[in-house]
From Swiss-Prot:
Residues spanned by motif 'HIGH' region: 21-31
Organism (species): Rubrobacter xylanophilus (strain DSM 9941 / JCM 11954 / NBRC 16129 / PRD-1)
Cofactor(s) demanded: Zn(2+)
Pfam families linked: Anticodon_3, tRNA-synt_1g
EC number(s) stated in the UniProt entry for this protein: 6.1.1.10
Name of the protein: Methionine--tRNA ligase
Gene3D superfamilies: HUPs, Isoleucyl-tRNA Synthetase, Domain 1, Methionyl-tRNA synthetase, Zn-domain
Length: 577
């Protein structure tokens, strides 16, 4: 039976979140490396250590991206989000993302929470009302969000510029600055009108935000310095309502036809999802331990485009709702923000690195990748290329190389030959020797050093760096097996061969322990034919025996034909075919 060894020391309680994905389209590999796979690896490691950890997420189901999709497809927003919620939940499960709760922002509970946050912020004096200019469509009889407006860019003259940014020159502007603006939906003319909205008075939090961020000594310095510089440059009020019909209603007279801005209600979804989890476990008030106990570490895994929001606006909201005598909310302990993933696409004999484009179908959609390959090899490759310090490139060719050489040739090869050799020549049982050979003791010492480094990097939320230590464990174990040469000693010195293979099984247990956060399905399958502790050498209490029966390879090679088909799909998308 596979038993994951838990470490005896328990330090903190953890609440881990991943950014809420918009429920308006499928997930792709860029999403995974940004906010979901690194969080899942981290959470799985914490669970193995025996830590108290809850991992929540959910779909972001409000805002313009949803309504645009609905109008384009001739559906209601509810139909769109219901479909994509189910699709995403299934895709996450297929990819072995182990949420404790996966919620959605269209639930009654979430609406109540959003309105409660608003009321508390208003009571604290952090909400104000102001007029602003916005585009209005006389034909449709409604105000149009920026993404509903197109026109000619006032900077470069591009004729299909969006209402907030020009895709041609990258310029940002107000929608009413466009030349000859028109509705993206009807093509009809639009005009500037005045509308009234509610605002979060972010400048009132500037001092507290600066002090809090300055105290985060474990944050990356570039991130800290950037946010502090932004605060010192002056924060602006942020609108929290929009002229839109789909979203959380605003509990304010005169605002019946408006809804909360999606940026305001989405992060409250973290709280709602935690409450759902607590309710489901039969302890409805337990969510407070994770949101109001200073002993909890709140960690938000996000993409870098969400950094400013999660380090200024969201913390300000948490600060502002805790001033009416209730227990204050904790603030984020860390906000690991990953960079972006581009694509390597073969076109006309050369390989190009291009940006993903969901509108052009230029992406590696996760559900399609899972139709081609099991989850573990995909997780393994993506873990090796997590964009922790800079943008990265997804390559099907590199995927094949990593899986075949590192996953199979290094880790899988070691596990397979140790267990198959044990079964073939020693009946599948290796009893504990009276003493381990000196070479085994040296390997154990090397493992302890690598295990310590792996654990330190994991707790620093750097799973890509920890991944390198996992591969180093595999290489060190293979060197020990090769040097022990049990194919020779089984004849010349059977007792030495048994002792060496016993040590090999101990190393195997450590490899399986450290591989579990990355390739969980394979390590679960290992329990079908390996009996022995799966834990660090550092914590190992040598068992009376290791046993193996029916060992078989855990992974399959990635063949050239499969890679060629996957690359062809990207090539066609790039060429618009």
């Amino acid at each position: 039976m596979l038993c994951l060894g838990a470490m005896s020391e328990r330090s903190e309680r953890y609440l881990v979140t991943s950014a809420l994905p918009y429920a308006n389209g499928p997930l792709h590999v860029g999403h995974m490396v940004g906010a979901y796979l690194p969080a899942d690896i981290f959470v799985r490691y914490l669970r193995m250590r025996g830590e108290d950890v809850v991992y929540v997420c959910g779909t972001d189901e409000h805002g313009v991206p949803i309504t645009l999709t609905a109008e384009r497809e001739g559906k209601s927003p509810r139909e769109v989000v219901d479909y994509w919620y189910a699709h995403m939940k299934e895709t996450f499960a297929r990819f072995s993302i182990s949420f404790d709760n996966f919620s959605r922002t269209s639930t009654p509970l979430h609406a109540q929470n959003t309105q409660l946050f608003y009321r508390k912020l208003k009571e604290g004096g952090y909400i104000s009302e102001a007029e602003s200019k916005q585009m209005y469509s006389p034909t449709e009889g409604r105000f149009l969000p920026d993404r509903y407006v197109e026109g000619t860019c006032p900077v470069c003259g591009y004729k299909e510029a969006r209402g907030d940014q020009c895709d041609n020159c990258g310029s940002w502007y107000e929608a009413y600055e466009l030349i000859e603006p028109h509705s993206k939906i009807t093509g009809g003319p639009v005009e500037v009108r005045t509308t009234t909205h509610l605002y979060l008075d972010l400048p009132k939090f500037a001092g507290r935000l600066k002090d809090w961020i300055s105290s985060q000594r474990h944050w990356r310095e570039p991130v800290k310095n950037f946010i502090i510089s932004m605060i010192e440059g002056g924060l602006e009020r942020r609108p929290i309502t929009r002229d839109i019909s789909w979203g959380v209603p605003v509990p304010e007279p005169g605002f019946e036809d408006k809804r909360f801005y999606v940026w305001f209600d989405a992060p409250i979804g973290y709280v709602s999802s935690t409450q759902e989890w607590a309710e489901r476990t039969g302890e409805p008030d337990r969510w407070r331990e994770y949101w109001q106990d200073p002993g909890t570490r709140l960690i938000h895994f996000i993409g870098k485009d969400n950094t400013v929001f999660h380090t200024t606006m969201w913390p300000a909201m948490l600060m502002g709702v805790a001033e009416d005598g209730e227990e204050p909310y904790i603030l984020p302990y860390d906000v690991p923000a990953n960079e972006f993933m581009n694509l390597e696409v073969p076109v006309e004999g050369e390989r190009r690195a291009v940006q993903m484009s969901t509108s052009r179908n230029l992406a590696v959609w996760l559900h399609e990748a899972l139709d081609r390959f099991p989850a573990d090899p995909l997780r393994f490759y993506l873990a090796s290329t997590l964009p922790e310090t800079g943008d990265v490139v997804f390559s099907w060719r590199e995927f094949q190389s990593r899986v075949n050489s590192d996953l199979i040739g290094n880790l899988g090869n070691y596990i397979n030959r140790v267990l198959s050799f044990t079964e073939r020549y020693f009946g599948g049982t290796l009893e504990r020797p009276s003493r381990l050979p000196a070479a085994a003791q040296e390997a154990f010492e090397d493992f302890r050093a690598l295990e310590e480094s792996y654990g330190r990097k994991m707790l620093d939320e750097r799973p890509r760096e920890a991944f390198a230590e996992l591969l180093a464990l595999g290489r060190r174990a293979n060197r020990f097996f090769d040097a022990a040469a049990p194919w020779k000693t089984r004849k010349e010195d059977p007792e030495r061969a048994r002792a060496d293979l016993y040590a090999c099984c101990a190393l195997l247990g450590s490899i399986a322990y450290h591989a579990s956060p990355y390739v969980p399905e394979a390590m679960e399958r290992l329990q079908g034919f390996f009996e022995g502790p799966v834990e660090r050498i550092t914590d190992l209490k040598p068992p009376g025996a290791y046993r193996s029966a029916g060992a078989r390879p855990l992974f399959s090679r990635v063949e050239d034909e499969a890679v060629a088909r996957a690359e062809e799909q990207l090539s066609r998308a790039l060429l618009g075919r």
